[in-house]
């Protein structure tokens, strides 16, 4: 049987509005630090940075 694998599910949150609306995955081995992606915020009506929440 196959092992668990290296990909982990992470939740992306916005500090300005407190939104946690995006779910994505990342490779634990290649990206050990916190993930930061630019995504659309429906509350602000613009693209802002969403950071990984643990």
From Swiss-Prot:
GO CC term (a single one): cytoplasm
Superkingdom of origin organism: Bacteria
MF terms in GO: structural constituent of ribosome
Keywords: Ribonucleoprotein, Ribosomal protein
InterPro entries, alphabetized: Ribosomal_bL33, Ribosomal_bL33_CS, Ribosomal_bL33_sf, Ribosomal_zn-bd
Pfam families linked: Ribosomal_L33
NAD listed as a keyword: no
Presence of the UniProt keyword Ribonucleoprotein in the record: yes
Disulphide bridges, residue numbers: none
GO biological process: one example: translation
Annotated NCBIfam families: PRK00595.1, rpmG_bact
Sequence similarity: Belongs to the bacterial ribosomal protein bL33 family.
HAMAP family linked to this entry: Ribosomal_bL33
Name listed for the protein in its UniProt record: Large ribosomal subunit protein bL33
